[in-house]
Amino acid sequence: MTPAAASTTAAPPADSTDTLDKTTLASFTADPVHGKQIFAQCQACHSAEPGKNMIGPSLAGVIGRKAGSIAGFAYSNANKNSGITWTPEKLFQYLEKPQRVVPGTKMTFPGLPKGQDRADVIAYLKNPT
């Protein structure tokens, strides 16, 4: 696929959780302690504290939240109009390669290719302490 073709590839449907690596969240035993360590990469742009938006929105309470819904945060139109609700499974897909799931998102992070790392970050975000 050429770079031009890649940029026009449609996002998976909002209710899809298919990953590029064909893994599922349920296939991993998540470790929130390791997830907190991996989340250190995310802290360049995100906080896990409620109401603390940075370059990216706060990820406190992200699970179950509609994408692009924190009042006062300047989301991309792609994110606001994605129709996504952040279930653990959808986050697992998104964190693999954010631009694939929400083309046009402001999030420039290329993703976490390892399914275990994604599962661990999600476990941490469920209860960030």
Label every PLM stretch briefly.
Residues 1-8:
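Short, low-complexity, disordered segments immediately C-terminal to signal peptides
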Residues 8-38:
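Electrostatic cytochrome c docking/interface patches
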Residues 13-16, 71-74, 102:
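Short, basic/glycine-rich phosphate-binding loops at helix/coil junctions
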Residues 32-36, 47-88, 106-109:
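Gly/Gly-Pro-rich "capping" loops immediately C-terminal to redox-active cysteine motifs
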Residues 35, 39-48, 121, 125:
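The canonical Cys-X-X-Cys-His
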Residues 87-129:
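C-terminal capping alpha-helices of c-type cytochrome domains
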